[in-house]
């Protein structure tokens, strides 16, 4: 057929037919390349063909200094150490009687309280901390004078130590809070509590005289924009006296604390806490031994994150209600540094 066309069209026809044939063959060769280019356009730049799209990074809670009274649930990082120093000044406007009413304190009493807290993470999901408080307790214009007519007195020293351990049982989930188990000694009787001097009007009692074993759970949940904390502890004190050959089991009590943080800016965080202790008797508690004390209060505060490692907190605890215990108002300031 091609020879027939060449004969009919002559030399010019030969040229035209050759050009047409070359164009047809070139189109066949270019078709696969065009198809490959079109397929390549379906793949995002920098993404291998057939790979899954990258997962979105889960949003985490903002950094805060943590509550001042309520214990945290998430342990410190492994191998890290933090140091916290709290300064608090308590004044006592009265006492709570057995009917939940406030009665006179019988004088002007004050306490300067400065605990130093050292926290360490020995292993993953584990934390231990030690609290050593310095206490200065004084009073004046006391209504009932001492043996020599004293109406004012003061006493200072180291109070009871606290040694606690914490282990994170469950991490925070989409619905479930983070849960940590807590166990240790809320009070180790290192503070002066026995053989009191009557001339010091009771202000030399800066310790409980009890070895208090504590166990419970700490909870944490970020419910945007709030960071929520809770403590539920049971405390079992055993009173130890040098002039008593047998240890005496004191009244057990429950500690129930709540705290909420609200980040105002990347540097400032608002804080509100509720604290309480609830006391009852068990079958081993001697009747009439240590009047059961119950206390409820709140503490508003403000946190300032100076750097990634240094933070400050200020607040004031206000005892709102109670039974058979002291009533006090306590402004406080905390400085914390993480190593």
Where on the chain are the PLM-derived regions?
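Outer membrane beta-barrel transmembrane domains
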Residues: 94-96, 247-339
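Short loop/turn motifs that connect adjacent beta-strands in outer-membrane beta-barrel proteins
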Residues: 71-80, 125, 170-180, 225, ...
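Surface-exposed strand-loop-strand hairpins of Gram-negative outer-membrane beta-barrel proteins
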Residues: 53-58, 88-113, 203
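Outer-membrane pore/translocation modules
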Residues: 136-245
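Residues on the lipid-exposed face of transmembrane beta-strands in outer-membrane beta-barrel proteins
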Residues: 71-72, 83, 87, 116-120, ...
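Transmembrane beta-barrel strands of outer-membrane/channel proteins
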Residues: 85-91, 130-134, 182-188, 230-236, ...
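Residues that define the transmembrane beta-barrel architecture of outer-membrane proteins
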Residues: 108-114, 154-161, 178, 207-213, ...
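Detector for outer-membrane/organellar transmembrane beta-barrel domains
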Residues: 78-86, 201-284, 337
